[in-house]
């Protein structure tokens, strides 16, 4: 009982609320939940749909044969590395734009968008040029062999161009998330990704009079899809909605007010991504050494886990948006209440999804594959995933609050300790010393998310994020 009371007190925000007393009007719980999900739901669904599009992409490319599939797979690593910088910058852009929106500083808000577009546009233009010149060297360094290096080199050149448009999309979508306009992010993503899947089908296989281009067609489809998303998002920031109008407000001249927080928050986020990548790289090596069945089963488990993971990413983005805006409005009490709403709703949703995963664990794998060994092992892993997503959701929401406040250095620190060091160490113990195999790997994943949840909540309870200036 004492342990339960201690846990309730640890996760309670009552102490923080008492410290932030206000005479201003406070919305009721129903209003807060409604407003939160108005922002969170489109962001969450956009992440899930993106993951489904990537899955469709993978299936169509896989039909071309192992060499073409390997070429696409080997390019995914340099592609992720290219995207890490703008992904980190996106966290900073959301935090800055949300804070300026809350402060009512539309000039500063639009300056952030314009300067970020200029800076990252120039940077990624340079990346594209270098990628075209050194494409074969890059994919060779990534591990491509002679069987498919030519395919991989050509594919990477197109993907580098798609990453350029993706980078610009991240700048604009991060800004829209910052002001709470996730609906346009969902709409643009749905249109662009649907077009991507359609063009994949037409260009990969040469349907309805289109040329049969194989993986080159898949890459071209990705470029066009991202370009369309960029055009839609670019139009959205010229209309004046939510205070965003880059045609009439803001400046392209670089200023300390934009670059200082962009550098600070972005660097911390970049380090977080680096530490996560290190941990995942070590994990991949461990899983590969467990054998083909374990590797294949893990791949299917990741695909299923990602569907919910990206839903949590949407909740995290919404939490960052509300935190930044409410702190900008000098309403720390509301920042706490929106965080509480996200945590509570996230808890019940994760429990509900966890129960579904647990009850349907055998059926899900039976639909995807007929190998009994994979079904048995996958069902065991799904039991862990059904529990894992509960602390994972809390960790995502709470980390989103810290990012929205600009207090994300702590996240980078615990990502180094947990993801890059502790998680691989625990995975080695569980999988190899205790001989639990792939199940041990996923127990380490659970430990990772549970510790992140505790440490993020510890930082929240310290209240430092409420005082953070951007």
Where would I find each of the regions flagged by the language model?
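Short alpha-helical transmembrane segments in multi-pass integral membrane proteins
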Residues: 2-43, 97-164, 210-267, 323-388, ...
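N-terminal transmembrane alpha-helices
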Residues: 28-59, 63-64, 77-92, 96, ...
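Transmembrane helical elements of multi-pass membrane transporters/channels
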Residues: 38-57, 158, 192, 225-229, ...
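Transmembrane alpha-helix boundary and packing residues in multipass membrane permease domains
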Residues: 43, 47, 58-59, 76, ...
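Alpha-helical transmembrane segments and their lipid-water interface positions
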Residues: 50, 54-57, 61, 83-90, ...
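Helix-terminus/linker motif at the lipid-water interface of multi-pass membrane proteins
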Residues: 52-70, 139-146, 202-213, 274-307, ...
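Small-residue-rich hydrophobic transmembrane alpha-helices
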Residues: 58, 69-129, 166-185, 297-359, ...
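Short runs within selected transmembrane alpha-helices of multi-pass transporters and secretion channels
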Residues: 90, 94, 159-177, 185-193, ...
């Amino acid at each position: 009982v004492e342990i339960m009371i201690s846990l309730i007190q640890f996760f309670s925000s009552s102490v923080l609320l008492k410290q932030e007393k206000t005479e201003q009007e406070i919305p009721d719980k129903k209003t807060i939940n409604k407003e939160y999900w108005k922002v969170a739901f489109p962001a969450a669904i956009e992440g899930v749909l993106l993951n489904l599009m990537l899955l469709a992409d993978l299936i169509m490319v896989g039909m071309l044969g192992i060499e073409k599939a390997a070429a696409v797979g080997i390019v995914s690593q340099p592609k992720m590395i290219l995207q890490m910088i703008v992904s980190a910058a996106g966290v900073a852009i959301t935090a800055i734009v949300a804070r300026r929106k809350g402060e009512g500083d539309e000039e500063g808000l639009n300056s952030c968008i314009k300067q970020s577009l200029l800076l990252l546009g120039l940077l990624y233009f340079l990346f594209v040029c270098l990628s075209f010149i050194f494409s074969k060297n890059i994919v060779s360094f990534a591990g491509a062999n002679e069987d498919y290096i030519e395919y991989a080199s050509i594919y990477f050149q197109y993907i580098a161009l798609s990453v350029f448009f993706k980078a610009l999309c991240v700048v604009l979508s991060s800004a829209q998330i910052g002001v709470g306009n996730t609906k346009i992010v969902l709409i643009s993503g749905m249109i662009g990704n649907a077009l991507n899947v359609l063009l994949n089908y037409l260009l990969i296989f040469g349907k309805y009079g289109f040329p049969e281009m194989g993986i080159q067609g898949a890459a071209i489809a990705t470029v066009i899809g991202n370009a369309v998303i960029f055009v839609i998002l670019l139009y959205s920031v010229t209309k004046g909605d939510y205070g965003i109008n880059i045609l009439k407000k803001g400046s392209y001249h670089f200023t300390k007010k934009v670059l200082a927080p962009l550098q600070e928050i972005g660097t911390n986020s970049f380090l977080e991504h680096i530490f996560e990548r290190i941990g995942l790289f070590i994990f991949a090596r461990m899983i590969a050494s467990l054998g083909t069945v374990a590797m294949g089963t893990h791949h299917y488990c990741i695909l299923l886990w990602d569907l919910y993971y990206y839903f949590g990413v949407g909740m995290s983005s919404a939490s960052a948006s509300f935190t930044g805006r409410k702190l900008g409005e000098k309403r720390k009490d509301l920042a706490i209440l929106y965080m509480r709403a996200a945590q509570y709703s996230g808890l019940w949703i994760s429990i509900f999804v966890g129960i579904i995963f647990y009850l349907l664990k055998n059926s899900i794998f039976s639909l995807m594959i007929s190998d009994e060994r994979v079904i048995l092992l996958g069902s065991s892993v799904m039991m862990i995933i059904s529990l894992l997503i509960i602390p994972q959701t809390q960790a995502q929401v709470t980390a989103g609050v810290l990012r929205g406040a600009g207090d994300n250095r702590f996240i980078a620190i615990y990502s180094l300790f947990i993801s890059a060091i502790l998680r691989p160490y625990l995975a080695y113990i569980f999988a190899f010393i205790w001989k639990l195999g792939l199940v041990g790997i996923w127990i380490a994943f659970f430990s990772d998310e549970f510790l992140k949840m505790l440490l993020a909540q510890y930082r929240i309870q310290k209240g430092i994020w409420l005082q953070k200036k951007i």
